[in-house]
UniProtKB/Swiss-Prot annotation:
Disulfide bonds: none annotated. GO terms for molecular function: uroporphyrinogen decarboxylase activity. It comes from the Bacteria. It comes from Cereibacter sphaeroides (strain ATCC 17029 / ATH 2.4.9) (Rhodobacter sphaeroides). Its main location: cytoplasm. Pfam families: URO-D. It is found in: Cytoplasm. PROSITE patterns: UROD_1, UROD_2. Belongs to the uroporphyrinogen decarboxylase family. Homodimer. This is Uroporphyrinogen decarboxylase. Pathway: Porphyrin-containing compound metabolism; protoporphyrin-IX biosynthesis; coproporphyrinogen-III from 5-aminolevulinate: step 4/4.
């Protein structure tokens, strides 16, 4: 097996960690901005396979990352389930809201999502053909809790108050929504794998707002179900899980869910994560602060070396603790890659 990303996901400790970045296809790159302008708007970019494939390939051409991640959005799935989705300039995504069981039952079934998502699968097929042979191809979806927070509130929020309210005041409706999203997520990811994705990543951006038993019930349990069903269909499929800002919840997350790798954010130190999460055997992905992609210089070099050093005694995939920001300097990403690869 020559793909370093897949070797790390199988538990191999490598002298140089594979590297890719969350949101590596993004607004910090001039070529991305040009292609997005060509598409007209963000959703059109997601749903135009040739252009979505192009922006996926751009950071691979520029930096030679070890992995490419499908260009899409976690909110395409709720749109396929029947939610209205639009993006407001400077405000981010907006959706129609689900606040009761009636709203849940009005959603499409898990087998009815594929017509809307067909362009995404075509993007996967294009990339499976066009990516360099050494580049691992990652598909992804949002985790049910995070997707549900948007479906309930109609927008992102700092505290996910609307989702917590539904969870605490109408548990049957909340659990029914989680079930519908979980089932659809499994089918969505299965189609991505059938179309050529070699790895899938589960993004639980708002997992940190789940505490105690709620974290077990609505972050761990859905991840375990998704991982087990996908691995039953695709034996050996590597899965990366990212329960962002889980803190102590990162400990044992891979073991509890069956994920092959746990991605961690930069609110925890690499040394803590190496001891408590990686523990010499569990593949960890992360966790450089994205701010260094803006500031650059010797600070970036030293912070990068610290992350590499912390995780060098176990399987590690180098990434940021969160997505690269539009303010990042493309030259700083070059410096990052050169620092890791010792160029």
């Amino acid at each position: 097996m020559t793909k370093t990303m897949l070797r790390a996901l199988k538990g191999e400790t490598l002298p140089t960690p594979p590297i890719w970045l969350m949101r590596q296809a993004g607004r910090y790159l001039p070529e991305y901005r040009a292609t997005r302008a060509q598409a007209g708007d963000f959703l059109s970019l997601c749903y135009t396979p040739d252009l979505a494939a192009e922006v996926t390939l751009q950071p691979i051409r520029r930096y030679g990352f070890d992995a490419a991640i499908l260009f899409a959005d976690i909110l395409l799935l709720p749109q396929a389930l029947g939610a209205d989705l639009w993006f407001e300039t400077g405000e981010g995504p907006r959706m129609s809201t689900i606040t009761d069981m009636e709203g849940v039952t009005a959603l499409k079934g898990r087998d009815d999502i594929h017509e809307t998502l067909a362009p995404v699968y075509e993007t996967c097929r294009i990339l499976a053909r066009e990516l360099p042979k050494e580049t691992t191809f990652i598909g992804f979806a949002g985790m049910p809790w995070t997707v549900a927070t948007y479906m309930i509130a109609g927008r992102g929020s700092k505290d996910q108050a609307a989702a917590h309210k539904l969870k605490d005041t109408d548990r049957p409706a909340f659990e029914a929504l989680m079930d519908r999203v979980t089932e659809a997520t499994i089918e969505y990811l299965a189609k991505q794998v059938e179309a050529g994705c070699e790895v899938v990543k589960l993004f639980d951006s708002w997992a940190g707002s789940l505490k105690g038993q709620d974290f077990e019930d609505f972050a761990v349990a859905p991840a375990k179900r998704i991982v087990s069903e996908l691995k039953a269909r695709f034996p050996g499929l590597p899965v990366i899980a990212f329960p962002r800002e889980a803190g102590e919840g990162y400990i044992g997350f891979a073991e509890k869910t069956g994920a092959d790798c746990v991605a961690i954010d930069n609110s925890v130190s690499p040394e803590w994560a190496a001891e408590k999460v990686q523990a010499g055997r569990t593949c960890v992905q992360g966790n450089l602060d994205p701010k260094y992609m803006v500031t650059g210089g010797e600070e970036l070099v030293q912070a990068t070396k610290r992350v590499v050093e912390a995780f060098r005694n176990g399987p590690h995939i180098f990434n940021l603790g969160h997505g690269i920001t539009p303010e990042a300097d493309p030259e700083n990403v070059t410096l990052l890659v050169e620092t890791i690869r010792g160029k």
